[in-house]
């Protein structure tokens, strides 16, 4: 089995050039003086990934207030990314305000250790990297294909890193910068039904009484 090479905390984040939904980008040159949250998703038009992108977009201003640029990535083509972004806008009324890298040759994914063969040799896992305004890798988190990320925790992580830098301190378990007003709702208790694998299944799925935003993204209570 191929050995996965991972970047290391405290070292410069791997440099790259890539095509995105916002045009070509060059890292770190295009992001000097900014923090970056670079995150990969397994594939466009998949349900868990869609919920993550909706959540990142809804919290975009929170990241912006912290001088953080979001960058998404998968091995899909730019055409697929654009179609998916348009689908998200149509079905959820949400604009995706950050670039998504089209890493079809897996060049960036391999630099950041996003391909884990035991999970998939053709999809990236849910990897996330926090890179500071000096281009240094400060934190990384890997999630399996089945589990969506908690965007509030990503924001808390950024807050903790920036507070540690600014104040010369460390943050304890469960630390938050101030009392939070975030509340969980019934929506947070729903799970995603695996997407259909045939056209017939897709048609049936829409008739089975699940809560479906589109044919590929349906939820239910358990």
UniProtKB/Swiss-Prot annotation:
SUPFAM superfamilies: Thioredoxin-like (SSF52833). The active site is at 49 (cysteine sulfenic acid (-soh) intermediate). Disulfide bonds join 212-218. One of its GO terms (cellular component) is cytosol. GO terms for biological process: cell redox homeostasis. It comes from the Bacteria. The keyword Amino-acid biosynthesis does not apply. It is found in: Cytoplasm. It catalyses: a hydroperoxide + [thioredoxin]-dithiol = an alcohol + [thioredoxin]-disulfide + H2O. The keyword Nucleotide-binding does not apply. Gene3D superfamilies: Antioxidant, Horf6, Chain A, domain2, Glutaredoxin. Homodecamer. Pentamer of dimers that assemble into a ring structure. Belongs to the peroxiredoxin family. Prx6 subfamily. The active site is a conserved redox-active cysteine residue, the peroxidatic cysteine (C(P)), which makes the nucleophilic attack on the peroxide substrate. The peroxide oxidizes the C(P)-SH to cysteine sulfenic acid (C(P)-SOH), which then reacts with another cysteine residue, the resolving cysteine (C(R)), to form a disulfide bridge. The disulfide is subsequently reduced by an appropriate electron donor to complete the catalytic cycle. Thiol-specific peroxidase that catalyzes the reduction of hydrogen peroxide and organic hydroperoxides to water and alcohols, respectively. Plays a role in cell protection against oxidative stress by detoxifying peroxides. This is Peroxiredoxin. It comes from Aquifex aeolicus (strain VF5).
């Amino acid at each position: 089995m191929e050995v996965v090479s991972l970047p290391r905390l405290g070292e410069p984040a791997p440099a790259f050039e890539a095509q995105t939904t916002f045009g070509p980008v060059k890292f770190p040159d295009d992001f000097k003086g900014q923090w970056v949250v670079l995150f990969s998703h397994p594939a466009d038009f998949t349900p868990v990934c869609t919920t993550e992108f909706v959540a990142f977009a809804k919290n975009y201003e929170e990241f912006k207030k912290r001088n953080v640029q979001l960058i998404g990535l998968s091995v899909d083509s730019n055409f697929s990314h654009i179609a998916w972004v348009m689908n998200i806008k149509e079905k959820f009324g949400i604009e995706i305000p950050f670039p998504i890298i089209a890493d079809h040759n897996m060049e960036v994914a391999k630099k950041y250790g996003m391909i884990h063969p035991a999970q998939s040799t053709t999809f990236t896992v849910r990897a996330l990297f926090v890179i500071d305004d000096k281009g240094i890798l400060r934190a990384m988190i890997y999630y399996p294909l089945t589990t969506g990320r908690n965007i509030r925790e990503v924001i808390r992580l950024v807050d903790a890193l920036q507070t540690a830098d600014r104040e010369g301190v460390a943050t304890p378990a469960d630390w938050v910068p101030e009392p939070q007003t975030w509340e969980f709702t019934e929506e947070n208790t729903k799970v995603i039904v695996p997407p259909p694998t045939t056209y017939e299944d897709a048609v049936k799925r829409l008739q089975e009484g699940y809560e479906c935003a589109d044919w590929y993204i349906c939820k239910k209570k358990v």
